[in-house]
Structure formats: C-alpha cells, structure tokens
C-alpha cells in the first residue's frame, strides 16, 4: 500500500502498486462514448494519466497540457483515467477542445485503481484516483510516477526525458 498527500495530509492508497518492469495489469475502462478502452495491452505504447477528476483545476490543466504534447510522444496513445462519468468526460473534452488524447472512466469496477495501486482509500477523496503517470510499452510498465501531492502536476520534464527529450520534431533525437 502506498501513501500520497492531499493538501499536506497523508492519504493511504488501496490496491497493488505496480513497478517498472512488471507486466502491466490489463483492465477495460469506459470511454466517453461508452465504448471499451483497454489498458495494458501488448502491441502499443500507452501513457496513462491517473487523475482524481477532470472537474478540478489541476486535473483540467494536466489534460490540456498533455493534449498539446501528444505528438511529442512518438505515437504513444495518451489516456486520462478518472472516476468521472463518461458523459462528464465527454462534456469536458468538448468544452476544452481536447481532441488529441482519450479519456477513460474507472467508475464501473474501480479495477484500474486497485490493479495499479492508485485508488484513494480514505479521506475527502476516498474512492477517487491518485495522480500518477504510467507508460506501458508492449504490455510492460516502462515508466511510473506516483505524484506525492495530489494537488500538484506530475513532472512532465521527466516524462519528456523518458521519451528522449522534447525537441521541435517530437523527441526523435534528430537535434
């Protein structure tokens, strides 16, 4: 069990913490159109952004920032996961012009939260997801950042470095 902070106060997380190098747990989540989005499948690269709710300022900013940066991640599929209802996620994407990434809801079974160890288990945000970033390559966890303070953004510079930097042409290493 991991612990993060919410406004400086420790909060316990429920579920199994996944580590870099481990097989990525496969889970099915609901997209904004109620179709299924599979997390953890082999054959692709996924950047998973776990957030408490798109209806909070920090989460909304994170989604907007990553929406702008998707092209710099060498064809990786970027998915924002929260407990928001798919309909609310769709409205958020429409209102904010989010078109370059996917949103997925874990509201049905909280399977993502438990299998990735980011389900908040106590306090005011109990039942929501902690802020984290996972990169899944070929079905394996290749990168993980569990953000210590839920109200803060993940370290985007570290993720950029993982993908080879953020050059003008998408981190391809040609500069």
UniProtKB/Swiss-Prot annotation:
Q: Which residues form the Thioredoxin domain?
A: 18-165
Keyword Glycoprotein (UniProt): no
Q: Which Gene3D superfamilies match?
A: Glutaredoxin
Organism's domain of life? Bacteria
Q: What class of enzyme is it?
A: oxidoreductase
Q: Which family does it belong to?
A: Belongs to the peroxiredoxin family. Tpx subfamily.
Name the chain's protein.
Thiol peroxidase
């Amino acid at each position: 069990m991991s612990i993060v902070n919410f406004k400086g106060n420790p909060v316990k997380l429920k579920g199994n913490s996944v580590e870099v190098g481990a097989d990525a747990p496969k889970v099915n989540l609901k997209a904004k159109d109620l179709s299924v989005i599979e997390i953890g499948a082999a054959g692709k690269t996924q950047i998973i952004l776990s957030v408490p709710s798109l209806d909070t300022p920090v989460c909304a900013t994170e989604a907007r920032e990553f929406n702008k940066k998707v092209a710099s991640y060498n064809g990786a599929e970027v998915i924002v996961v929260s407990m928001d209802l798919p309909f609310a996620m769709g409205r958020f994407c429409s209102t904010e012009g989010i078109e370059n990434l996917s949103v997925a809801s874990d509201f049905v079974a909280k399977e993502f939260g438990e299998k990735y160890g980011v389900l908040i288990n106590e306090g005011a945000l109990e039942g929501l997801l902690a802020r984290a970033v996972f990169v899944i390559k070929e079905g394996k966890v290749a990168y993980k950042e569990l953000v210590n303070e839920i109200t803060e953004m993940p370290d985007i510079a570290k993720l950029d470095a993982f993908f080879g930097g953020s050059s003008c042409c998408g981190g391809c290493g040609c500069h």
